[in-house]
Swiss-Prot record:
The Gnk2-homologous domain, residue ranges: 35-139, 144-248
Compartments where found: Secreted
CDD domains: Gnk2-like
Signal peptide (UniProt feature, chain positions): 1-28
Family, per entry: Belongs to the cysteine-rich repeat secretory protein family.
Protein name per its UniProtKB record: Putative cysteine-rich repeat secretory protein 36
PANTHER family in UniProt: CYSTEINE-RICH REPEAT SECRETORY PROTEIN 29-RELATED (PTHR32411:SF54), CYSTEINE-RICH REPEAT SECRETORY PROTEIN 38-RELATED (PTHR32411)
GO cellular component, one term: extracellular region
Pfam families per record: Stress-antifung
Presence of keyword Signal: yes
């Protein structure tokens, strides 16, 4: 009787522990993939309902949804002539191509319509990135304006200078990998830091020519804003970088 009771008690404890672990994993995934930031491009003005601009916008949104399979996680589509010209740039994180990217598409679309209702131009960042604009910038131009940073509130406990140098060097190595012709402007990896692992990724929009220049600038900006932080990211419309002390990419 005693051994049967002990076994049942162990099974209950194991079940509770498994559920708690699952909840933590789901919560972590939700935090990783959740809405990050948005920007309504007020300077580009607003459009009226049932206008030619709205017609062009809705056409592109529906066209991408019905035709794109996102094999490389990216699309840049335009329609119309000024003042009703619309261009959409959509890109998924480098670990979310194909069907994962396709399922991600609806989230920023609904988010941008809710947060920037009626604005001709808007940008939203979550696991996917969406940029709607009336301006078709040439791919040689890096957008240094529409950027932001986020970081863990806690600092590392170990030698901060050593941590910063190793993190910076690791991001530079990933930058060089992402800049290679067949890399798809994306690289990710992990490295050992004492008793912990450091996880990082770098990614450029597929339509910019100078990926290395953009990433190098972003790494420098990250060093200014997020010195000694346990995790941080710097995001823009041309490229983005991130590092954490826990795995955050899909496998």
């Amino acid at each position: 009787m005693h051994s049967s009771y002990s076994l049942s008690k162990c099974l209950v404890c194991f079940t509770i522990l498994a559920i708690q672990t699952l909840i933590r994993r789901v919560s972590s995934l939700n935090r990783t993939n959740a809405y990050l930031n948005h920007k309504c491009l007020v300077i580009q003005g607003k459009y009226k309902r049932q206008s030619e601009y709205e017609e062009n916008l809705n056409y592109i949104i529906d066209h991408i949804s019905s035709t794109q399979k996102f094999p490389d996680g990216f699309t840049h589509t335009s329609r119309g002539e000024a003042p009703n010209f619309v261009t959409i740039v959509f890109q998924c994180r480098g670990d979310s191509y194909g069907s994962k990217c396709r399922s991600c598409y609806a989230t920023p679309i609904s988010g941008i319509r809710r947060r920037c209702q009626g604005y001709k131009g808007a940008i939203i960042w979550d696991q996917c990135f969406l940029d709607i604009s009336t301006i078709n910038s040439p791919p040689t131009m890096i957008d240094y304006e529409n950027t932001f940073s986020m970081h863990n509130q806690n600092n590392v406990n170990e030698d901060a200078e050593s941590f910063n140098k190793k993190t910076r060097d690791f991001l530079y190595n990933l930058m060089l990998k992402a800049d290679k012709p067949k890399a798809g402007s994306y690289a990710a990896g992990e490295m050992r830091l004492g008793t912990k692992n450091l996880y990082a990724m770098v990614q450029c929009a597929l339509d910019i020519f100078e990926c290395k220049v953009c990433l190098e600038w972003s790494i420098n900006e990250l060093s200014k804003c997020c010195h000694s932080k346990k995790g941080a990211r710097f995001l823009g419309t041309s490229c983005n970088i991130r590092y954490e002390l826990y795995p955050f990419l899909s496998t």
